[in-house]
């Protein structure tokens, strides 16, 4: 897979958001959230912040293998490899992972949102969700182009199958609906099966989480 392969939206400006590894008040805020079993994806998915999110979920699993973990998402998408590391960690740990989006869950952000524990996938009322196919630059020699094109095609099918599994649609339906940028309002995402609830108040979410 090309390192350029991503499922970030074409033409979409980079989302401003916290990056792991800084210092100061922002770090203190995110450490406080972690103590409350909340991890936050607030920027483009990159290998660096994906590693941090995986480590945080593994830590929370080690501390309590039963209590829910909350993954909050406001992301334009990004690295497929980074996103798949987060996805596999969500499946690996024993905890339910509740996913919550505000602002935007686009591309890989949508994929991770929909991959949350069934019944515990949430959107705030004005969130926007984007589903589409992975993007990747293909260059080099003819042989390299053919290899990368096959990898991109395989990645497209793999992600589409997982999206189908988590949303209750067929692979064919997901491939058709995501062939071009497909934007959803929170309510439309609920009706399509990408999420389970549209909530405007945190107390509603907590009521769905008996382990908290």
Swiss-Prot record:
Keywords: Cytoplasm, Hydrolase, Protease, Serine protease. One of its GO terms (cellular component) is cytoplasm. It is found in: Cytoplasm. It catalyses: Hydrolysis of proteins to small peptides in the presence of ATP and magnesium. alpha-casein is the usual test substrate. In the absence of ATP, only oligopeptides shorter than five residues are hydrolyzed (such as succinyl-Leu-Tyr-|-NHMec, and Leu-Tyr-Leu-|-Tyr-Trp, in which cleavage of the -Tyr-|-Leu- and -Tyr-|-Trp bonds also occurs). Gene3D superfamilies: 2-enoyl-CoA Hydratase, Chain A, domain 1 (3.90.226.10). The keyword Flavoprotein does not apply. It is an enzyme of class 3 (hydrolase). The keyword Protease applies. Its main location: cytoplasm. The active site is at 107 (nucleophile), 132. One of its GO terms (molecular function) is ATPase binding. PROSITE patterns: CLP_PROTEASE_HIS (PS00382). Its EC number is 3.4.21.92. Residues 1-20 are annotated as: Disordered. Transmembrane segments: none annotated. InterPro entries: ClpP, ClpP/crotonase-like_dom_sf, ClpP/TepA, ClpP_His_AS. Signal peptide: none annotated. Disulfide bonds: none annotated. GO terms for biological process: protein quality control for misfolded or incompletely synthesized proteins. Fourteen ClpP subunits assemble into 2 heptameric rings which stack back to back to give a disk-like structure with a central cavity, resembling the structure of eukaryotic proteasomes. HAMAP family: ClpP. This is ATP-dependent Clp protease proteolytic subunit 2. It comes from Cutibacterium acnes (strain DSM 16379 / KPA171202) (Propionibacterium acnes).
């Amino acid at each position: 897979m090309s390192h350029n392969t991503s499922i970030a939206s074409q033409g979409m400006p980079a989302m401003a958001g916290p990056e792991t590894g800084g210092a100061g008040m922002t770090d203190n805020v995110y450490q406080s959230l972690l103590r409350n079993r909340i991890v936050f994806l607030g920027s483009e998915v990159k290998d660096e912040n994906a590693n941090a999110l995986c480590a945080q979920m593994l830590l929370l699993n080690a501390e309590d293998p039963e209590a829910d973990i909350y993954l909050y998402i406001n992301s334009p998408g990004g690295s497929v490899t980074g996103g798949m590391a987060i996805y596999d960690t969500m499946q690996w740990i024993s905890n339910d992972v509740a996913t919550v989006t505000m602002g935007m869950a686009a591309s890989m952000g949508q994929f991770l949102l929909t991959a949350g524990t069934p019944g515990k996938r949430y959107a705030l009322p004005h969130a926007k969700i984007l589903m589409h196919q992975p993007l990747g630059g293909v260059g080099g020699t003819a042989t390299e182009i053919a290899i990368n094109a096959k990898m991109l095609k395989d990645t497209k099918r793999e992600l589409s199958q997982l999206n189908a599994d988590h949303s209750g649609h067929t692979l064919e339906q997901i491939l058709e609906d995501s062939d071009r940028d497909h934007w959803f309002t929170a309510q439309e995402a609920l009706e399509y099966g990408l999420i389970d609830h549209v909530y405007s108040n945190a107390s509603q979410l907590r009521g769905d989480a008996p382990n908290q």
